[in-house]
Curated annotation (Swiss-Prot):
Tissue spec. comment: Expressed in testis.
Note: Association analysis reveals significant frequency of a synonymous (Ser-225) sequence polymorphism among clinical groups with different sperm traits: the donor group, which has the highest sperm count and motility level, has a significant higher polymorphism frequency compared to normal and asthenozoopermia groups.
Protein name: Spermatogenesis-associated protein 16
Gene it is expressed from: SPATA16
Keyword match Transferase: no
Native organism taxonomy: Eukaryota, Metazoa, Chordata, Craniata, Vertebrata
Stated role: Essential for spermiogenesis and male fertility. Involved in the formation of sperm acrosome during spermatogenesis.
Cellular compartments per GO CC: acrosomal vesicle; Golgi apparatus
Entry keyword set: Cytoplasmic vesicle, Developmental protein, Differentiation, Disease variant, Golgi apparatus, Spermatogenesis
Length: 569
């Protein structure tokens, strides 16, 4: 597909968002486990409401629905949880793969278990490429309204040609139905390029309003579900064609359109795996497992497969990491300073080559697939410690984690960067900062928004790419950030102020993708400038205090010399 038609298709898909929604595994490296069971920037929103409001409304509406399920599950499991605690929390978990010892005891170092590539491919065949014989699409709310619980095919539910057997489901447009049938036929014949072309045609029909039989009365969420299904089919087509780079944006868009469906996140994880972006694949798999539970999924076999995939991606990310090593410390009590020092001492003994700089993440707790149970109160949690060979590779973490406004700059004049400075900062962000943040978030479900969500850094990275006119990369980063923004309300409770910020970020991201320009600066750039001004003021304050201290010391020294001179006389 040439650049012109690609741009046209992207604009068509963005119009759907705007008009209808708006918004070979190697495990030779070792990982250590320690054990003991264990004011946002104010801004006017009026300009953004018409652009980004509907996506946030849909996201919040779906969040309420899934939160209701979560509360019901929590109530059902609460008694059992307290009973287990009363019987004794010291009882070992039977299926844990890592041996657990007391924190004060000897640290155990063990090789990561090898997960064969065949096992990973089996998970993908069972959960990612499933239901290829039928044209199916996603209507989450329909299942909720009928009171039935989603099964392993929860959201991919019905062939449009047999939709009359499910009277509670909307009827899709007949021309769109024909396009989807042709695409499905090509796919079954393994003509993946032709199938992708047909699915792109179907996507263009969606952008023109040909989605459901009653377009004027169709809920935006149902339209989003159909478009999300088409995006997922494009993902599988490109994966079959071994072109994960073409599948990536479609995987992101399917999540923007329907963030509640766990398979969308698992497909995104598969794309990341094919691109060897293992930390991001691990996070997507973690979210997929959580969404499966949150949506009422009760088939333990599916959750085990997702957790296996999540575990394999974490292990591969650790194996591929060259600049740092990692240690997870299970705990159940309050984190004390002396415990952190013990963890760092243990890390130094175990990984002396990575002790140049150590960082312990206190912003949020971490979970591992070997022990996580979303229905427990709370799940087994871990303290993450990273150690670096080079001090410069990790010292930025302290700065990012200690501020409310996430910004990064290494220049004394951040407001007037030359092209060389921009290239240098872009490479630093893309090769050194973002990969580490992505790894941290691969076991962290819900960091605070926006400080430790990682979204703001990605959007600021996209701005650097834009300044260097790297449009294709910028588009991918923004699409990924939008997928993460759409998922945030499902992972954590957000305040009204945070919801407004999320809405503005989503609207600005969509405007950027569509090439829209206005007189207002992008929200993430405004936040970055505020942070840079803060840094500048702090530097002035530090400089003033240092100068004052030196001046006082000189005066005191001069005074003492005068006294000595007088005494000598």
């Amino acid at each position: 597909m040439d650049a012109g038609s690609s741009r046209s298709l992207e604009n068509a898909v963005n119009r759907i968002y705007h008009d209808q929604l708006v918004p070979k595994i190697n495990t030779s490296k070792k990982m250590s486990t320690l054990a003991h069971p264990p004011n946002i920037l104010e801004m006017s929103q009026e300009i953004k409401k018409n652009c980004g409001g509907k996506q946030v409304e849909i996201t919040l509406e779906r969040t309420k629905m899934t939160k209701g399920i979560k509360e019901k599950q929590s109530n059902d499991l609460e008694k059992a949880a307290f009973k287990r605690k009363a019987e004794g929390e010291e009882k070992p978990t039977r299926k844990k793969q890592a041996k657990i010892t007391e924190l004060d005891n000897q640290l155990i170092t063990m090789p990561l278990p090898h997960i064969p590539l065949k096992n990973i491919m089996d998970v993908e065949m069972k959960l990612v490429y499933i239901d290829e014989m039928g044209v199916r699409y996603e209507f989450v709310e329909s299942f909720m309204s009928t009171g039935s619980q989603p099964t392993c095919q929860a959201a991919e539910i019905v062939d449009p040609l047999s939709v009359h057997n499910f009277s509670f489901l909307p009827q899709i447009d007949k021309w769109l139905q024909v396009a989807l049938k042709d695409a499905s036929s090509c796919y079954r014949q393994k003509k993946y390029a032709l199938a992708a072309g047909q699915f792109r045609t179907a996507l263009e029909l969606c952008s023109k309003g040909a989605v459901l039989g009653e377009p004027f009365d169709a809920p935006a969420e149902d339209i989003a579900s159909v478009a999300s299904f088409i995006e997922t089919k494009l993902v599988t087509c490109y994966l079959r064609m071994r072109k994960p780079d073409l599948a990536l944006n479609h995987a992101h868009r399917s999540i923007v359109l329907n963030p509640a469906y766990f398979r969308n996140h698992l497909r995104q994880a598969t794309v990341f795996r094919c691109l060897e972006r293992y930390s991001e694949a691990a996070r997507s798999a973690m979210i997929a497992d959580y969404m499966f539970w949150l949506g009422g999924g009760r088939e333990e076999s599916i959750s085990k497969l997702i957790k296996l995939y999540w575990q394999a991606m974490i292990e591969e990310a650790i194996t591929r990491a060259e600049s740092f090593s990692v240690m997870y410390t299970p705990f159940a009590t309050k984190i004390r300073a002396d415990k952190i020092e013990k963890v760092k001492d243990a890390f130094t003994k175990t990984h002396p080559a990575y002790a140049e700089y150590m960082y312990t993440d206190l912003q949020a707790l971490h979970m591992l697939p070997q022990t996580v149970d979303w229905s427990s109160f709370p799940p087994q949690q871990y303290l993450l410690t990273l150690g670096f060979k080079n001090k410069d590779d990790g010292k930025f973490l302290e700065k990012i984690s200690s501020r409310k406004l996430p910004i990064f700059t290494e220049h004394k004049t951040p407001f007037g960067l030359t092209r060389e400075d921009t290239v240098r900062q872009m490479e630093t962000m893309g090769k050194r900062i973002l990969p580490i943040l992505d790894f941290i978030r691969s076991t962290q479900l819900n960091g605070s928004f926006p400080a430790s969500s990682g979204v703001m850094e990605k959007l600021q990275y996209a701005s650097l790419l834009s300044q260097l006119q790297r449009v294709k990369e910028q588009s991918q980063v923004i699409n990924q950030a939008m997928a993460e923004l759409a998922t945030i309300p499902y992972l954590q409770d957000i305040s009204q102020q945070e919801a407004e910020l999320l809405q503005s970020l989503m609207a600005d991201a969509m405007d950027t993708l569509e090439g829209r320009r206005n007189n207002n600066e992008r929200v993430w750039n405004m936040i970055q400038k505020v942070g840079q001004i803060e840094d500048f003021l702090y530097q002035l304050e530090d400089s003033f205090l240092k100068t004052k201290k030196l001046r006082t010391a000189r005066r005191q020294k001069t005074k003492m010399k005068r006294l000595q001179t007088v005494q000598q006389r």
